[in-house]
Amino acid sequence: MTAPRVALVHERFTEYGGSEAVVAEFIKTWPGAAVFAPIVSREGHDSLVAAVASGRRGAPAHDGAADDAAGQGISIHDSWLSRAHAAIGGGAHAPLLPFVPRTLRRLPLAERFDVVVVSHHAFATQAVFATDAPVIAYVHSPARWAWDGAFRAQEAGGKPGQLALAGLGHFARRAELRAAPRLAHVIANSHAVADGVRDWWGLPATVVNPPVRIDRFTPDPSIPREDFFLFAGRLVPYKRADLAIRAVQRAGGRLVVLGDGRHRQYLETIAGSETTFLGAAPDHVLLDMYRRCRAVLMPGVEDFGIVPVEAMACGAPVLAVAAGGALDTVRPGRTGEYVEFGDDTAVVEGMACLIRDFDPSRYDPAAISRHAGTFAPTAFRARIGDVVARAAG
């Protein structure tokens, strides 16, 4: 049987995060697939290539940037927006967002592919208007800043930002709703995201949790658990590191904050001597912290959340709010505990109670690590390949 011709569509490769890791696994699932993204930076391109190369051989090709090495491995097709992104300094991509939907609708997909798989955050589903082939959307989340007013206010950073996001949000909602009926199938990265797809798009979704590179994170029984809790991740408002700080203060514990971001300065103003900020750190430092901490704190609502799975792979329990992706990953009493989701005061009080009485010896690190293994990339590739094959007919 001839292998299907697959196109993969992503909104931008300007950094490497969880959604880019998903695309890397898509490429491993369908070797030779063409990859399209309106905005591609050199850093984003190289990070994707490195991630794919870690699992297969083949040199990259970057179409539209400088070096055309077609046929040698990965073919990434970008657009004029890459050059515009570089011209404005290669940093923020937000000024270019209004141009992304139209660019996606004009992708050269017609009559070239048997199935198109899009990696969607806000606009990728616009690719349905560029092809008659079945389009399957892997949804990291419908655009939360477009649909969720509280999230938008939290992330906007002031009235001007809120007004700008409100305008762009109206645009994004219309774009998502226009594309939704044309999708052949929707895959959500968690049950929480599937609920959003149902509520906002009016569509059912199959849940396939994203891959986590747990091979980099393993337990070490020879390392004793120490007397501190860990928050790891980007320091941006929706991650709610502020609640972790307040909960540890209330419980009289110690906290290590690993990560950096625009919210760090504010967090340092509310933290006391109980909190240590280590900034951004390489994997070997993160691994060491996962192995040594009493537990990892997850006070924010994530669409999925990679950090809890990495922590569990190292045998660390996770204390998380009972909402969002944590409902897919944390098993109370076995791999961690839930804090009832509510207002900030309720979350702080609930997490402080868990911290105050927390005993890591109640948990089996080996069992926690085995549970994390269910999110391995190999499991993801098998599941996503099966779902897409059935949906594409």
Describe these PLM feature segments.
Residues 98, 342, 359-389:
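A charged, aromatic-enriched C-terminal amphipathic alpha-helix characteristic of glycosyltransferases
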Residues 220-256:
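Conserved donor-binding/catalytic core segment of Leloir-type glycosyltransferases
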Residues 265-288:
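Nucleotide-activated donor-binding/catalytic signature segment of Leloir-type glycosyltransferases, i.e.
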Residues 291-303, 316:
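Acidic donor-binding loop of glycosyltransferase active sites
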Residues 297, 317-322, 330:
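Short hydrophobic beta-strand element within catalytic cores of glycosyltransferases
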